[in-house]
């Protein structure tokens, strides 16, 4: 096999004992036929050094800037390898003596690896690092932290050094992509007490099989011509205005739109062989034809003049394609700069998708689609049935879930209001244009193109829907695309259903969402314990509140039990009858409830695999997947859950709920009883509402100081629905990786790993962007991710802040091209970037501004108290915020304390700014001045 030959050709032998005494061995003494030696000796000291034997038919270049032996004797030999016309790879042969500090990974190897990443190649690090990967000690943790943060994978799994008394795994191979690995392992030999490790590499990308898609062809689509053609049918569109039957209106609307669009952008089935190049214009195609013509002429004549002409055409084609690609990418990024998902689509279109496999099914696609649809449409019904069985198996006595729902006064009922054309236009223009279309294959791009023509009829149709309490039948059909999560793609449960709805239906949903959300906010109908789908609320604000509660408990020498509840298929199993009753109780008028009833019922879906569709099946449970209204409806469904809990606190972000309770260690026994009682109450409530609560995935985390946690009995556990739940060391909650000490070490480590992976992806295609676009892409996709919920964890250690700074430095080098040995500060200043420490301070300050000015949830705003609100004495500090008193440094890590301190230290001119936009601008100017 070619891949085996390649792998054998790339065999790399390394040895840490290639010199003896102070006189090193010569290359002739250690030569191997057909191999070239690349060596890195330890100078002026006996023993040591590494070398690599590279087969002579492989082009090998030592990266001298990266290769060195440090003062502490840490060895790094970096080599660029290229075999034939395959893309080159980089290997690093390394050795760490046992007496070299473990800091060498962070201080020496990591900077060089990050610099190697800028070369945009796959990397292998291999050698004897004297870190036993079979023993959970300090050495293993140090090496694991290193390769985890840099998205490397350690592929050797068995002992590499065996003695009479021990077995250790100290010789490792770290790879930047497991897709490269064909085979790896350890070779049994008696040459040395170190067993050789090996890896076979597959360097050629597999040829992707063709796939088919059915979509509209916009090759000859012209928005102006389409709109002009639509104007000729305005009489049919205007006839809509005299009709009040919303189903008839929609049929007419779709018929006019479809018949016109079918002419300008007909539905076609395409065979996709290669990635599309929309930027290759007809002019470039003609140049390519001329280039190929001159190449054929040279091949016939072998004339040097013909070769020169061919090269001119070839270079001209390359230049024009590169320029066209950059222009196309820039325009795409500029259009979707505020949508990170769209930006990733753009980047993934540029990067060849080597690891993505076209799904091939052993059964007929029609049969698979039918089986998948049967499974997906039964998920909600089965979850509700399982919830009922779970209650029966655990002797949970279920009662009527509607008996304790609070009913609000009838003089404050919600009624739909007619919407204006201006409001509909605003909603449509704010919607992204690149979302996948629904069953009708009409995307938002087309709706925007013809909006001046269809706006009146569309607005009338939405108003008819609201006034007649009717949701059109054609809008209740969804197309489902199965997306593989993991495992066998032919098993339906291994796939996630992506539900596609008609884009015009989402406009109507957005109108309803805006009106109903405003009503719920005005009359304060949503529980204060629900932070999802509410203005001024976010995952960050809820995380701040909960972590502050836990830090305050530690300050008071208490522990906190945090229980993260897991609801399986929560959106799918919602009972329509219960939800409609709760809508009525929360204030929706009978007419509004009737509209929601029509919206929820009578729905169906079909599954599409490639170009094959299943038959449609009815959906009897749940809120619609992929619908704009679904999160709000679910929040209303569980709105009274927090009120049922007795001794603990319960907070939610949509369907993510948590129980938590702070307690003294001496009250551990009673607290355990209280926790189990509230878990039972929560389980009973969920099961009564047909929500399947999963005890096996429920996480139990104890948070406290190290001394307090050491006093907790190791056998502590909770019993929940027949399952024993023991405390975990780490748990992920709303995107934050929590540990028992709230150190955020694990969170930062995973964050660094994720950001570095994204930067490597972007670095591979950075030549497709100009610097301005590249900066925008990195800020949107990497820096924004790095700062997610930063006000929660910005109180972490300086060591973690330094790790994040290294990510920002790498991002800066990707954009600016600054070399490893060049100082990074001027480049950061040129990009107008704050260092990470100042960046975190900026975000903390903005959150403090929001809390002081009522732009945050009440549960945060209420902690920002003016001293003048406490006493009437007129003092110099009368207008400052009251600083909360904490006994320990842990208490001072709370955002409550940090935010108040930050606010009090601000200049009065900055505090008095009334616009948050201007405040952010002025704050950034001040921090930039302080930084540089």
Where would I find each of the regions flagged by the language model?
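Short phosphate/oxyanion-binding micro-motifs
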Residues: 1, 5-120, 133-137, 141-152, ...
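Active site of divalent-metal-dependent phosphoester/diester hydrolases
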Residues: 38-52, 133-140, 151-177, 239-243, ...
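Active-site palm subdomain of RNA-directed nucleic acid polymerases
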Residues: 112-123, 512-530, 553-555, 631-660
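Short, charged alpha-helical motifs in flexible N/C-terminal segments and linkers
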Residues: 1, 11, 276-383, 417-462, ...
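Surface polyanion/phosphate-binding segment centered on an Asp-His-Pro turn
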Residues: 5, 80-89, 119, 177-274, ...
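Conserved pre-catalytic core of RNA-dependent polymerases
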Residues: 376, 410, 414-624, 661
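Short, conserved micro-motifs composed of acidic
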Residues: 31, 139, 159-179, 184-185, ...
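Surface-exposed loop/turn segments and immediately adjacent short secondary-structure elements
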Residues: 200, 204-206, 229, 241-248, ...
